[in-house]
Amino acid sequence: VQISRGGGAFVAGESTALMATIEGNVGEPRAKHIHTVISGLWDRPSNLNNVETWANVPFIIDNGADWYSQIGTEGSKGTKIFSLVGKVNNTGLVEVPMGITLREIVYDIGGGIPGGKKFKAVQTGGPSGGCIPESLIDLPVDFDRLTEVGSMMGSGGMIVMDESTCMVDVAKYFMNFLKDESCGKCTSCREGTKRMHEILTEISEGRGKPEHIELLEELGWVTAEASLCALGGTAPNPVLSTIRYFRDEYQEHIINKRCPAKVCRALLQYRVISEVCKMCGACAKVCPSEAISGKTKTKKEKGIPFKIDEQKCIRCGMCFESCKFEAVEVQ
């Protein structure tokens, strides 16, 4: 057994790119018209599997295929390890039988959503996986079913999201990562991920247009179909899945210039409720842009309720966090 240090980049995990790094070359994928089982590492037939697969091999050899096949579904046998993280009470690595439902993982194993908040979505498969909505929480988890709903098994990542999560922001976050990790070899992946991130940024900052949704879908399909490796082939998943299941959230950002989850800072408006304001001045003290005016109430003088100048406000949220009387509202 020999252990080699990989290239480090996300794309270097792709099979042919991984072999290239072992050979000492740049970790770029190559065309698959010749499969690695025919010509792989140093142009020799090569069988590449991940660590989890190799860990199962000794048990299958010792106990037989029938023993291993007792667990799982028709098309996905055995168990799967997931990294369960996000808005869930119990986080960590969990090993579950194939075919278990998302509900069982999130609620029975994960302990549900903290603070009594509502489950919104779960993203599976790593950075290029798709987001699965609450309406599909009883979906059995296996390779085929995850692919059918626009996600994938991938590296076994599972990020739970609650009602405070903005799906446009989620798509933008993952596209930012994927555009940086693209090796740039194929135009579709290099330019497609970059352009999708640019459009998502425009939408989240209030410059979105109705036609942007269809443009994102078109870019996503072209990027997936024309890319050389699985990174480009799956990179649009965060965008396409969030549009598929949360289109209304995109429309709210574009048409009403509003972020329902109150995450996209450029679309937020902070307002002091004068009837609730205690005129303590806490909000004005922490405002970095001096956008809040008013007069502090003292024993000798009457105060003036504070107000926020929208032109000066940088939407940092400091006023909202500092107010103990819930006199600052976010719209």
How should these model regions be labeled?
Residues 140-269, 274, 293-305:
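Ferredoxin-type iron-sulfur electron-transfer modules in oxidoreductases and energy-metabolism complexes
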Residues 18-33, 135-152:
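Active-site loop ensemble at the mouth of alpha/beta enzyme cores that anchors a bound cofactor
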Residues 99-115:
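Short amphipathic, charge-patterned alpha-helical segments
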Residues 1-98, 110:
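Hydrophobic alpha-helical positions that pack around
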Residues 78-90, 96, 102, 262-314, ...:
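C-terminal accessory/binding modules appended to enzymatic or scaffolding proteins
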Residues 1, 114-148, 244:
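Terminal amphipathic helices with adjacent charged low-complexity linkers/tails
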